[in-house]
């Protein structure tokens, strides 16, 4: 983006009228100052030819090569993890009845063995990029499989996966193999040769856009108000801030406001020489924190690797020059770069420089069009209206990172037989491998279409599919996202038109959030509350679990009629009124007001409270026996409290078994929490080693199948069992797999007000 100091100035033409000496001196000083700050002068922008010359200015390739190496290396680590190579057989196993969510319905996964081949090609492409071996071909070998896998599954889309594809696309057109590459060893013309400035401009511009647009998106009122990541401040990383700030102020000032300021300013801080050290410090601290806060794979490390792109292009040579001479022999050359045909060299005194050729013109056009496109796409939602729900645009390319947090309270899928009219219900997520379809109209349409093709196998003819999905976004009321009266199989959906069956977000109720927080804080630890908002003419059918012995509904706004189904009674509630709900029965809540109704369920899980009291009594009894204050003998059924479960001994009661399980779990948590750093680091390494081991073994099996044919099912089962082994981990370690392969944190546990609440 910026041209660093040392740029050649354009010499004035000899036929121009000489100006007075003071004017020339003043102009020279101004030009030099502008070049020092921005890296270019106004004369570099005076004509298209000047712009082309500027963007193709010869630049040191060292910085670009370091980024190429680091980015490709991180992609090698990413492929088995977030790209899913280690669990590929679970996702694309042949013969599964699975509903998938590609960008285009024509996109289909290949048979499993061929999918492993696709990933192998992608891995080899990343390896070639890293080494600079057959560089251009390696970029293509990585890029095409990457975008195929990316477009194959919208449920895995996120901003950083999209960014990886963009960076790989950019590198494909760049001369990043002109330094520290195998190609340079094999081809003298590419070894230590200049690269055009636009190679850096595109990459710097991309990273600048990621930061700045992310900051602009955080100007959203929810982010500024501190609602987007409200609970993040509970993480131990924010403990130093909580020494001087409350948790609420830490969330508002540190998480939200500082995050906003950093995103808005990071690109500018990195751009200018004077502020770059400050920018490098803060963005490095920011990404190191993110690596611990979120399961986002290689993203923090890719951003850390991109930060030096803003530094002087020759910084790797300066670093090599400071190394011991013996070490310098193993490192890339520190010699000055050589001329390259990819660059345009300014004319020297008395000589006319070469004019920019077609390749130089194309490089400049690519740079300008690409950056303009990247500035436009995050705001192109008016074109892709079908993807707009409560948030705008296709998820993943708008850079609205962490701005919206959702909680799903209730999901119900109803099917109706088109011939008999028979109604039935499906488990949410049946025939899928993801939960993300619940938030997006395009995926819901794909899911309904898929279900309509699968249900006839289960004697459901011409199925109609209805979804009742309740979502809260950024701590608002739980409300319906889609119209539950619409058959989504027959519903109209277009990527370029607004989806009519998406319910609007009730923004008018946003000010209620402060009051809702006050209500929550006023309740005791055993009392739970769920806040509901519903549209006129709709109703909620709900079931109160028998465990909830004390459940009431209270109206906050509007007017509702509550029907107790078993008792065949109706009661209308006005604002502020409430009524008790019987446990173990269904009820319906009808919104009869002309405006949306708001109400809340307040309930106590009496079964859970009783269990907690019993467990607390057992814990107290155990402590009394251990410290000698309880001298009487324990009943036989309580002996396991002291001795644990003994084979052949008395059978513990269910309560004692629950107590012992909890004790073991708490002890394991405490052991892991207090384990020394080297043990935790070893566990981390062993988990990653398992991921890479399984990726390699399963890939070897599939490539063998393609080359030699599949062996017997018995042999395949033995080979897969061997691939699933964890030979490096201690026996007592848990068998949790691929902690980094998921980009989405688990949702909160469902409540008990409904079978799915």
From Swiss-Prot:
Residues 734-745 have a biased composition (Polar residues). The chain crosses the membrane at residues 61-81, 114-134, 137-157, 293-313, 362-382. GO terms for cellular component: endoplasmic reticulum lumen; endoplasmic reticulum membrane. SMART domains: HTTM. Disulfide bonds join 99-450. It is found in: Endoplasmic reticulum membrane. It is a multi-pass membrane protein. The vitamin K-dependent protein substrates of carboxylase have usually a propeptide that binds to a high-affinity site on the carboxylase. CO(2), O(2) and reduced vitamin K are cosubstrates. This is Vitamin K-dependent gamma-carboxylase. The gene is Ggcx.
């Amino acid at each position: 983006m910026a041209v660093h100091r040392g740029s050649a100035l354009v010499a004035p033409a000899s036929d121009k009228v000489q100006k007075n000496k003071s004017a020339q001196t003043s102009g020279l000083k101004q030009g030099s100052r502008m070049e020092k700050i921005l890296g270019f002068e106004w004369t570099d922008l005076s004509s298209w030819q000047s712009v082309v010359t500027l963007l193709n200015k010869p630049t040191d390739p060292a910085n670009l090569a370091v980024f190429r190496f680091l980015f490709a290396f991180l992609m090698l680590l990413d492929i088995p993890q977030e790209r899913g190579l280690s669990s590929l057989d679970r996702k694309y196993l042949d013969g599964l009845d699975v509903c998938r969510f590609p960008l285009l319905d024509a996109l289909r996964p290949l048979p499993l063995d061929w999918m492993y081949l696709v990933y192998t090609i992608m891995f080899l492409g990343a390896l070639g990029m890293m080494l600079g071996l057959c560089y251009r071909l390696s970029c293509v070998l990585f890029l095409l499989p990457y975008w195929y896998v990316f477009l194959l599954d919208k449920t895995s889309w996120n901003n950083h996966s999209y960014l990886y594809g963009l960076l790989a696309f950019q590198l494909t057109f760049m001369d990043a193999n002109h330094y520290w590459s195998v190609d340079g060893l094999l081809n003298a013309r590419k070894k230590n040769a200049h690269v055009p400035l636009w190679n850096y401009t595109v990459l710097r511009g991309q990273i600048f856009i990621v930061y700045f647009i992310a900051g602009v998106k955080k100007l959203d009122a929810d982010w500024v108000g501190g609602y987007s990541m409200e609970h993040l401040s509970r993480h131990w990383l924010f403990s130093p801030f909580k020494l001087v700030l409350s948790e609420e102020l830490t969330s508002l000032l540190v998480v939200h406001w500082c995050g906003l300021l950093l995103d808005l300013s990071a690109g500018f801080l990195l751009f200018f020489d004077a502020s770059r050290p400050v920018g490098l410090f803060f963005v490095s601290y920011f990404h190191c924190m993110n690596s611990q806060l979120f399961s986002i794979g290689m993203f923090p490390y890719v951003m850390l690797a991109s930060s030096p792109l803003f530094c002087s292009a020759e910084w790797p040579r300066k670093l090599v020059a400071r190394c011991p001479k013996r070490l310098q022999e193993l490192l890339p050359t520190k010699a000055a770069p050589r001329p390259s045909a990819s660059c345009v060299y300014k004319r020297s005194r008395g000589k006319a420089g070469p004019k920019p050729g077609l390749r130089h013109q194309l490089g400049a056009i690519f740079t300008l069009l690409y950056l303009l496109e990247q500035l436009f796409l995050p705001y192109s939602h008016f074109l892709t209206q079908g993807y707009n729900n409560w948030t705008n645009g296709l998820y993943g390319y708008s850079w609205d990172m962490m701005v919206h947090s959702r909680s799903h309270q209730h999901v119900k899928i109803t099917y109706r037989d088109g011939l008999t009219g028979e109604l039935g219900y499906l488990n949410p997520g049946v025939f899928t491998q993801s939960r993300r379809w619940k938030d997006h109209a395009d995926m819901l349409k794909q899911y309904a279409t898929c279900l309509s093709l699968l249900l006839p196998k289960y004697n459901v003819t011409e199925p109609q599919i209805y979804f009742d999905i309740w979502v809260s976004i950024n701590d608002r009321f739980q409300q319906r996202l889609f119209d539950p009266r619409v058959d989504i199989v027959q519903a109209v959906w277009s990527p370029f038109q607004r989806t009519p069956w998406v319910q609007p977000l009730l923004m008018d109720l946003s000010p209620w959030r402060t009051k809702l927080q006050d209500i929550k804080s006023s309740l005791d630890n055993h009392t739970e509350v769920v806040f509901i908002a519903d549209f006129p003419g709709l109703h909620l059918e709900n079931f109160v679990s028998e465990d909830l012995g004390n459940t009431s509904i209270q109206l906050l706004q509007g007017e509702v009629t509550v029907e107790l189904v078993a008792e065949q009674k109706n009661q209308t509630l006005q604002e502020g009124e409430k009524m008790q709900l019987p446990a173990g029965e269904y009820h319906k809540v009808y919104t009869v007001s002309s405006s949306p109704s708001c109400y809340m369920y307040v309930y106590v899980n009496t079964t859970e409270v009783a269990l907690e009291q019993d467990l607390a009594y057992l814990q107290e009894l155990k402590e009394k026996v251990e410290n000698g204050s309880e001298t009487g003998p324990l009943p036989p059924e309580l002996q396991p409290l002291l001795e644990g479960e003994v084979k052949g001994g008395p059978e513990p009661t269910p309560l004692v078994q629950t107590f012992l399980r909890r004790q073991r779990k708490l002890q394991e948590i405490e052991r892991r929490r207090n384990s020394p750093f080297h043990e935790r680091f070893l566990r981390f390494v062993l988990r990653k080693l398992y991921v890479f081991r399984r990726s390699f073994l399963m890939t070897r099996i599939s490539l063998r199948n393609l080359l030699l044919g599949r062996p017997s099912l018995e042999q395949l089962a033995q080979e897969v069992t061997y691939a699933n082994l964890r030979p490096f981990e201690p026996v007592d370690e848990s068998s949790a797999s691929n902690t980094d392969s998921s980009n989405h944190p688990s949702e909160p546990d469902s409540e008990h007000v409904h079978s799915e609440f």
